[in-house]
């Protein structure tokens, strides 16, 4: 009798979970219709197992979300002893491109340290600092090699900033899929890709990111621990990737959207709305 009772409870729980995932999908499809948008979402656990998703295998332009795995690559080099965080990277005015606030600020001194550039790339989305790091690691191809090294066979970087933000429909360059990037986030933060010290530092940077207050973070409950890296592209691209801790459970998340008919503010609101849909799913399945 107890066995039958247990089976019934398991069946009810499975049915409820399936219902919540259907609601998740339905809510995202509704947002897509209302906003004339395409929305890609992947949520995975620390082992990279899928929790939920939508358009998970569809390619989207990475935009500046790649700056998080770029920073991870920099930390890997530091961890292995092939790089020093305090090494000064010299540069001149030619390194100043659109949206380079920290690079401009340090220009008078003629250099930034490796860690200063990495932090600026993550927390400010500084394009000059990003290109400076790309110069040091060996260019976009080296970034793609790092993706492959940590098990991501999909994500690719082909150009530097700002050219990589073209987001031309059908162009495979500088793209990823939500599931590939979510698993990359999980690998970096939970999979032992970095030392504990480097992992802690990059988590702290993501939590202190200064470009994401209006995106996923705005759609999540205030008591969740959230760290993320945003991205913005031409043709309506607005993205956010990172991690969150909800009810003592850790998750990696990747959200990629294309909404060319929306304003910049409306695209932020769209990503925040996706955050609300994710919240509803997580709270309902963690009961």
Swiss-Prot record:
Gene3D superfamilies listed in its UniProt record: DD-peptidase/beta-lactamase superfamily
Q: Which family does it belong to?
A: Belongs to the class-A beta-lactamase family.
- Record-annotated active site: 64 (nucleophile)
Extra facts: The class A beta-lactamase family has a specific amino-acid numbering system, sometimes called Ambler or ABL numbering and often misspelt as Amber. A multiple sequence alignment was used to derive a consensus sequence and then the consensus was numbered taking into account insertions and deletions. This allows use of identical numbers, e.g. for active site residues, despite differences in protein length. UniProt always uses natural numbering of residues, hence there appear to be differences in numbering between this entry and some papers.
Q: How is its activity regulated?
A: Inhibited by the beta-lactamase-blocking agents clavulanic acid, sulbactam and tazobactam.
Q: Which reaction does it catalyse?
A: a beta-lactam + H2O = a substituted beta-amino acid
UniProt GO BP = beta-lactam antibiotic catabolic process; response to antibiotic
Annotated GO molecular function terms are:
beta-lactamase activity
- Which keywords has UniProt assigned to this entry? Antibiotic resistance, Disulfide bond, Hydrolase, Signal
Q: Which cysteines are joined by disulfide bonds?
A: 63-233
The EC number of this protein is 3.5.2.6
Supply the InterPro entries for this chain: Beta-lactam/transpept-like, Beta-lactam_cat, Beta-lactam_class-A
Organism, per UniProt?
A: Pseudomonas aeruginosa
The conditions that induce or repress this protein are given as: Expression may be regulated by promoter elements associated with upstream probable integrase gene Intl.
What this protein is called in its record is: Beta-lactamase GES-2
Q: What class of enzyme is it?
A: hydrolase
Per its database record, what is this protein's job?
Extended-spectrum beta-lactamase (ESBL) which confers resistance to penicillins, as well as first, third and fourth-generation cephalosporins. Has modest carbapenem-hydrolyzing activity. Has cefotaxime-hydrolyzing activity.
Annotated binding of a beta-lactam, by residue: 67, 125, 161
Q: What are the boundaries of the signal sequence?
A: 1-18
């Amino acid at each position: 009798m107890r066995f039958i009772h247990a089976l019934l409870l398991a069946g009810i729980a499975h049915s409820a979970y399936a219902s919540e995932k259907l609601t998740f999908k339905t809510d995202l499809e509704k947002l897509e219709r209302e906003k004339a948008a395409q929305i890609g979402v992947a949520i995975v656990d620390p082992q990279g197992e899928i929790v939920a998703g939508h358009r998970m295998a569809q390619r989207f332009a990475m935009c500046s979300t790649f700056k998080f795995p770029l920073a991870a690559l920099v930390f890997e080099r530091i961890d292995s002893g092939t790089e020093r965080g305090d090494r000064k990277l010299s540069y001149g005015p030619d390194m100043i491109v659109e949206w380079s606030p920290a690079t401009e600020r340090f220009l008078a001194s003629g250099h930034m340290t490796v860690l200063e550039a990495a932090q600026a790339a993550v927390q400010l989305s500084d394009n000059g600092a990003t290109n400076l790091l790309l110069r040091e690691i060996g260019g976009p191809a080296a970034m793609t090699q790092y993706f492959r090294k940590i098990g991501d066979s999909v994500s690719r970087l082909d150009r530097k900033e700002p050219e990589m933000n073209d987001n031309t429909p059908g162009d495979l360059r500088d793209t990823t899929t939500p599931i590939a990037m979510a698993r990359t986030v999980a690998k970096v933060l939970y999979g032992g890709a970095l030392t504990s010290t480097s992992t802690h530092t990059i988590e702290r940077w993501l939590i202190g990111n200064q470009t994401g207050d209006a995106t996923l973070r705005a759609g999540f409950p205030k008591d969740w621990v959230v760290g993320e890296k945003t991205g913005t592209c031409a043709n309506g691209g607005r993205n956010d990737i990172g991690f969150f801790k909800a009810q003592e459970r850790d998750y990696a998340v990747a959200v990629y959207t294309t909404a060319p008919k929306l304003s910049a503010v409306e695209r932020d609101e769209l990503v925040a709305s996706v955050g609300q849909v994710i919240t509803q799913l997580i709270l309902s399945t963690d009961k």
